């Protein structure tokens, strides 16, 4: 057992109001500079829709994530080791600027300097790439906002698979939801596996995935390798950049900028302990619908005395273990089973999870317009947002976890309404979904009225425990899955046997050391 800690995030889609405050604040802090005008580390999409960049969920087109071979091993969908190298100078599956959008501003100066004329002056769009005027804006990062555009284009959404999507183009069957997206900081990141320069790495202390700007050579294979398309190429610097999970704030115990400024308070941050030795086994699960359950098995119970003892032996600080015990992410993902990972079928084991939305159709259920199931709760399958659509997005097509989450959320509302409004304690609904009174009351506190310290439980980092990285710095290039230690593979492109890392220690003069 190799115990590691990961700072994860849960987003409660049931409360997202689509205000884009998270996107704007992230943009102002991290990507408001030349070369990154088109990049949004955090963006909010309206679903159904093809998203940003266009059709990012279509891995047959973009070749992101992992695939399982017939021998049970996984490899990047982009290709084998040699297949990735062959694309190093000409990658045919990297998104173009038109797949994102051409960033633009407006000629505001013209409004002040325009000569007197018959018509009111207008501010025409101007490209932020070449500075030329644009005839018209044809796409943007939130072009499909509030179901903008015709349904025929939005119907290309991959989450409509195995569904009769034509019926949802009719007005009376229309549905929508918001989906805030950022880098998933996966346990099994495919961007790391496809980087020829070895510039992308995952930090052991908090699981944040970063790009070493000194080692990045701008091959852009990581952009294709990431199934969520959350790595962007800076055309000014010639380097790739991505969401850094605001690690300077995380290290000091503060939440990310998007979480701090979220108007709807939908974001939760917390620590999860996981067994790194089980990652490959979980990601190599044969059936895609089983990937969610296999990923849950990777996480460890922070209250288990044996886990605590082993974690301390392996150098996990005490404050990290205590934070994991109070983690809202662990409660929602593991205890209550409300939060689900985004597209687990990509086999990257993502660590930004989502609580499926229920609010848009709750009033319809209250009005009695839904058929009742055998119990107290209405039939969740008949609600406005199709369960299969949510399942294709959050559980690889398995409707079971989505139904469980939605039923538990509705049961919580039924119980709290009976207690607060009607003045009675009706436990029929929560008994039906397998929850206790204590669990439901805690769920209500976290989902509805959580305080700042409840939503963000982030341990401060221990810089005094950091090792000297001089020996490894800039010394780990393209290897065949063996880290910085040469290669165990029979075939070696660089014609070298396995090499053990040499620890470089500072040589001090004898008189100096006295």
Regions from the language model: what does each represent?
Residues 1-514:
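Non-ligating segments of multi-cofactor redox enzymes
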């Amino acid at each position: 057992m190799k115990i590691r800690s990961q700072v994860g995030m849960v987003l409660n889609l049931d409360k997202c109001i689509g205000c884009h405050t998270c996107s704007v604040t992230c943009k102002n802090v991290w990507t408001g500079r030349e070369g990154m005008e088109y990049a949004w580390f955090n963006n909010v999409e309206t679903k159904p829709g093809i998203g940003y960049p266009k059709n990012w969920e279509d891995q047959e087109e973009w070749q992101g994530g992992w695939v399982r071979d017939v021998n049970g091993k996984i490899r990047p969908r982009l290709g084998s080791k040699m297949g990735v190298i062959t694309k190093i100078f000409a990658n045919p599956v990297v998104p173009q600027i038109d797949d994102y959008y051409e960033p633009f501003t407006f000629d505001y100066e013209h409004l002040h300097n325009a000569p007197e004329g018959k018509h009111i002056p207008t501010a025409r769009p101007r490209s932020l790439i070449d500075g030329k005027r644009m005839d018209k804006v044809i796409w943007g990062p939130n072009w499909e906002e509030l179901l903008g555009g015709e349904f025929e284009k939005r119907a290309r959404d991959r989450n409509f698979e195995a569904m009769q999507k034509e019926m949802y183009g009719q007005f009376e069957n229309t549905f929508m939801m918001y989906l805030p997206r950022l880098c998933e900081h996966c346990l099994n990141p495919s961007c790391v596996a496809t980087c020829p320069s070895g510039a992308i790495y995952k930090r052991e202390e908090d699981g944040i995935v970063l790009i070493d700007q000194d080692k990045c050579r701008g091959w852009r294979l990581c952009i294709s390798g990431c199934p969520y398309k959350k790595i962007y190429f800076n055309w000014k610097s010639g380097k790739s950049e991505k969401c850094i999970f605001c690690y300077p704030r995380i290290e000091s115990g503060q939440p990310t900028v998007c979480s701090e400024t979220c108007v709807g308070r939908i974001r939760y941050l917390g620590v999860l302990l996981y067994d790194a030795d089980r990652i490959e086994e979980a990601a190599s699960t044969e059936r895609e619908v089983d990937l969610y359950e296999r990923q849950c098995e990777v996480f460890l119970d922070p209250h288990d005395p044996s886990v605590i003892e082993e974690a301390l032996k392996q150098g996990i600080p005490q404050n990290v273990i205590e934070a994991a015990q109070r983690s809202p992410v662990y409660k929602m993902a593991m205890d209550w089973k409300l939060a689900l990972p985004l597209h687990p079928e990509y086999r990257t084991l993502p660590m930004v999870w989502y609580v499926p939305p229920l609010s848009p159709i709750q009033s319809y259920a209250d009005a009695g317009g839904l058929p009742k199931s055998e119990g107290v709760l209405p039939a969740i399958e008949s609600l406005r947002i199709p369960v299969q659509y949510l399942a294709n997005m959050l559980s690889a097509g398995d409707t079971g976890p989505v139904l469980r989450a939605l039923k538990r959320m509705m049961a919580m509302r039924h119980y709290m309404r009976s207690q607060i409004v009607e003045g009675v304690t009706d436990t029929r609904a929560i008994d039906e979904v397998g929850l206790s009174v204590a669990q439901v009351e805690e769920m209500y506190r976290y989902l509805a009225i959580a305080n700042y310290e409840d939503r963000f439980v982030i341990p401060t980092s221990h810089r005094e425990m950091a090792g000297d990285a001089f020996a490894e710095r800039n010394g780990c290039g393209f290897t065949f899955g063996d880290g910085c230690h040469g290669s165990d593979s029979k075939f070696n492109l660089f014609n070298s046997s396995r090499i053990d890392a040499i620890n470089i220690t500072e040589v001090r003069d004898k008189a100096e050391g006295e």
